[in-house]
Amino acid sequence: IGRLKNGEYDAVREDIRAVKQAVGDKVLKVIIETCLLTDDEKRKMCDIVCEAGADYIKTSTGFSTAGANFHDVELMVKGVHGRCKVKAAGGISTVEDMEKFLALGADRLGTSRAVKILNGEQAKGY
């Protein structure tokens, strides 16, 4: 995040490329912590992550100030232009949330509350 905010885009891209080269055919998901970025930075990261060869760009770790939101997922889906996949993670607490993220174009969802959600319980907290 620091290098992105400092405008060191080539360094960020090369770091991701190096990781992708190291993992080879394994799936690489790059977490960008959308809650810490501006919309312009999120768009820039979509370009960088896809150009670097990552398989997924992911909204959050679940350990920062916020998780996935509809605005960010829609922005990311548009930003990747099908070049890589989008994973919405963090803060997903209802079936309706899951359905909306998928309708917006998320390819994968991440939640620690899947059992509660699928059992129809409101999963509380972040």
Labelled PLM ranges:
Residues 1-86, 94-120, 124-126:
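Alpha/beta enzyme core
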Residues 89:
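Short hydrophobic "strand-cap" motifs at the C-terminus of beta-strands
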